């Protein structure tokens, strides 16, 4: 795995690449296009594989929930945009993706994967990296899975909601926090209000 330039609390590495858009067209997109929005940017190893379609379809199926949070989901792999399109045009029952609600970026030179520190150099593919970038372009969360295990859309959605809550209210979110749950005031005295309610 490459070290990359992606660091929590710093600007997310910029990228510009060709993507297959939800309407099936090719378009060059960049991270800068989504300024003012949260972005969930995830890498997957390869098109036409086994775990990857389950993750991509799960994120695509729930794209509207992210959109309601002013958050854009973007997928990326080292495959060409032509390969992405062929996979999208393959029926789900045959291992394809079917119609997508999110853009899929092509990173054939592996520069984006390298910048984000997810390149598995010996195979020339990406680990399952997931990055939450806030509306100011700051990287707030990084997870990188080894190849065999997929990621949770529910947990990603929860993290976006939690970061947005802390941005807006200045309070911090305890383990397992969900919208509507108690939060903690980041102050020695005021935090006792939260802890006094715990069993």
Curated annotation (Swiss-Prot):
Protein name, entry field: Peroxiredoxin-1
Domain (Thioredoxin) ranges: 6-165
Cross-link annotation Glycyl lysine isopeptide (Lys-Gly) (interchain with G-Cter in SUMO2), location: 7, 120
Catalytic EC class: oxidoreductase
Positions of modified residues (N-acetylserine): 2
Source species taxonomy: Eukaryota, Metazoa, Chordata, Craniata, Vertebrata
The keyword Cytoplasm is annotated on this UniProt entry: yes
Subunit record text: Homodimer; disulfide-linked, upon oxidation. 5 homodimers assemble to form a ring-like decamer. Interacts with GDPD5; forms a mixed-disulfide with GDPD5. Interacts with SESN1 and SESN2. Interacts with FAM107A.
Main location: cytoplasm
Localization per record: Cytoplasm
EC number(s) stated in the UniProt entry for this protein: 1.11.1.24
Annotated region described as Disordered, given as residue ranges: 176-199
Biased composition (Basic and acidic residues): 184-199
Pfam families according to UniProt: 1-cysPrx_C (PF10417), AhpC-TSA (PF00578)
Stated role: Thiol-specific peroxidase that catalyzes the reduction of hydrogen peroxide and organic hydroperoxides to water and alcohols, respectively. Plays a role in cell protection against oxidative stress by detoxifying peroxides and as sensor of hydrogen peroxide-mediated signaling events. Might participate in the signaling cascades of growth factors and tumor necrosis factor-alpha by regulating the intracellular concentrations of H(2)O(2). Reduces an intramolecular disulfide bond in GDPD5 that gates the ability to GDPD5 to drive postmitotic motor neuron differentiation.
GO cellular component assignments: cytosol; nucleus
Cross-referenced Gene3D superfamilies: Glutaredoxin
Active site: 52
């Amino acid at each position: 795995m490459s070290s990359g330039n992606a660091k929590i609390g710093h600007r997310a590495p910029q990228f510009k690449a060709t993507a297959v858009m939800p309407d099936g067209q090719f378009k060059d997109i960049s991270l800068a296009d989504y300024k003012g929005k949260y972005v969930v940017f995830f890498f997957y190893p390869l098109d036409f594989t086994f775990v990857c379609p389950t993750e991509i379809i799960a994120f695509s199926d729930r794209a509207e929930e992210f959109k309601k949070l002013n958050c854009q989901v973007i997928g990326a792999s080292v495959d060409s945009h032509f390969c992405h399109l062929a996979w999208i045009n393959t029926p789900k029952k045959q291992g394809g993706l079917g119609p997508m609600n999110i853009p899929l970026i092509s990173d054939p030179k592996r520069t984006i994967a390298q910048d984000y520190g997810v390149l598995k150099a010996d195979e020339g593919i990406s680990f399952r990296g997931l990055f939450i970038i806030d509306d100011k372009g700051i990287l707030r969360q990084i997870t990188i899975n080894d190849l065999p295990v997929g990621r949770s859309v529910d947990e990603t959605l929860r993290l976006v909601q939690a970061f947005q809550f802390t941005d807006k209210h200045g309070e911090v979110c305890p383990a397992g926090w969900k919208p509507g749950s108690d939060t903690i005031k980041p102050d020695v005295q005021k935090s006792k209000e939260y802890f006094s309610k715990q069993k």
